[in-house]
Amino acid sequence: MIKQALISVSDKTGIVDFAKALSGLGVKLLSTGGTAKLLADAGLPVTEVADYTGFPEMLDGRVKTLHPKVHGGILARRDLPEHMQALEAHGIPTIDLLVVNLYPFVQTIAKDDCTLADAIENIDIGGPTMLRSAAKNHRDVTVVVDPADYAVVLDEMKANGNTVGYKTNFRLATKVFAHTAQYDGAITNYLTSLGDDLQHGSRNAYPATLNLAFDKVQDLRYGENPHQSAAFYRDVATPAGALANYRQLQGKELSYNNIADSDAAWECVKTFDAPACVIIKHANPCGVAVGADAGEAYAKAFQTDPTSAFGGIIAFNREVDEVAAQAVAKQFVEVLIAPSFSEAAKQVFAAKQNVRLLEIALGEGHNAFDLKRVGGGLLVQSLDSKNVQPRELRVVTKRHPTPKEMDDLLFAWRVAKYVKSNAIVFCGNGMTLGVGAGQMSRVDSARIASIKAQNAGLTLAGSAVASDAFFPFRDGLDVVVAAGATCVIQPGGSVRDDEVIAAADEHNIAMVMTGVRHFRH
């Protein structure tokens, strides 16, 4: 039964209302510093911890709750007579509810003008100590670290005579240990990122010790293949607009492959300003287009490779209206992603309940790092977020691209970044015409891309081609020109660049170099 609570919070969201409700249930309130003042100003009967322990706060507040009367009241097991006798002998009442959240360390180090001294002062000591004590003794103590749990605790107390059940206490305790682990992980990441000068502004993006924190969203039916188990986890600091923020409107449970392909589709479609549609199969774009609206973008994207689009993942960067929904509904689709769906569009898909509809708000930001597991280790790199600007391009051929060709080249280059290497992409008029992906030789990717276009009945005459990396020989260039391309965009950087440029001049096509490679594995 909860008779006494200790409240000490940095995030004061909802704390006054929570404390009022506790007081109304007859719970005695203990508090510290700014929290105690806030509660007292709200007219609540609150006892300062310093008055409770008989020992004043000291060292600029560094020592205030580190006292036996606090930790004894938290850690004592109520089912052990010797524990309760010890409390009685020393005049220590039990503390049955602990409400604590920690100094804002992560928010502090996110500031550009943060100093090491600022960071150190925002490392909480008393808070984690109390939290861990209460979480360890969760059979007897309810511990709350998240304001979102205030209502849960109050509801149980009101329903059960000021008592919170063991299952709830256990869940709250696990939340505490996850929170303190993440807190300590953030501190370690920061301190081990500092260089010899210990300056905030020159810290290493890759700390000596890297701690990552993810919360489980759901267990999955299986992994990449049916014999593999799997689960989906969300980054505790999920950036706005990330796939992990999806809201599923209808459809079956997402699979491992659904999530992986959906991420590829969403990341690609977000890069376009005009209404765009991306169709993904096995993490590769098989159709990408922009149009006047979602419906036109889809119609153009689907033309690229209708065969591969079967059972694909489709993403839009605009609301899906009824017209677009009716077009998509004619095909077999696994997942459809958009910032929103009109009510009419939802009605169209209501008749196709197996189609998974995901809403994700378009937003800025992306994952801080790209991670790849290897045997016994982890590769960590910055995200490939480079989008080349026209002024950064270098025309290396005698013929310059026309304005239309330049538009097509930039579109093709944007798509190529999301195609598995080796990647060759034919484009024209705001749509992909042929995609060659994942081949061990660039010339084979070029051949496959042209064959794909032929199979779809699309002409490559006057098309633009993007290559995610340089042409090591002229053979790949010869293939795309023979297929009908009149301009090419590629990074350059080969020892045979001169040979490839000479071949382009021989064919009288335009070639531009970006100086940026987009390998994707």
Swiss-Prot record:
Q: Which reaction does it catalyse?
A: (6R)-10-formyltetrahydrofolate + 5-amino-1-(5-phospho-beta-D-ribosyl)imidazole-4-carboxamide = 5-formamido-1-(5-phospho-D-ribosyl)imidazole-4-carboxamide + (6S)-5,6,7,8-tetrahydrofolate; IMP + H2O = 5-formamido-1-(5-phospho-D-ribosyl)imidazole-4-carboxamide
For this UniProt record, give its keywords in alphabetical order, as a comma-separated list: Hydrolase, Multifunctional enzyme, Purine biosynthesis, Transferase
The Gene Ontology terms for molecular function here are: IMP cyclohydrolase activity; phosphoribosylaminoimidazolecarboxamide formyltransferase activity
Entry protein name: Bifunctional purine biosynthesis protein PurH
Which GO terms are recorded in the biological process aspect for this UniProt protein? 'de novo' IMP biosynthetic process
Transferase as UniProt keyword = yes
| HAMAP family per record | PurH
The UniProt similarity line reads: Belongs to the PurH family.
What Gene3D superfamilies is this protein classified in?
A: 3.40.140.20, Methylglyoxal synthase-like domain
Q: What's a Pfam family in this record? A: AICARFT_IMPCHas
Q: List the GO cellular component terms.
A: cytosol
Q: Which organism encodes this protein?
A: Burkholderia thailandensis (strain ATCC 700388 / DSM 13276 / CCUG 48851 / CIP 106301 / E264)
Report TM segments.
none
Pathway where it operates: Purine metabolism; IMP biosynthesis via de novo pathway; 5-formamido-1-(5-phospho-D-ribosyl)imidazole-4-carboxamide from 5-amino-1-(5-phospho-D-ribosyl)imidazole-4-carboxamide (10-formyl THF route): step 1/1; Purine metabolism; IMP biosynthesis via de novo pathway; IMP from 5-formamido-1-(5-phospho-D-ribosyl)imidazole-4-carboxamide: step 1/1
EC number(s): the record gives 2.1.2.3, 3.5.4.10
Q: What is known of its domains?
A: The IMP cyclohydrolase activity resides in the N-terminal region.
- The MGS-like domain is annotated at 1-145
SUPFAM superfamilies in UniProt: Cytidine deaminase-like, Methylglyoxal synthase-like
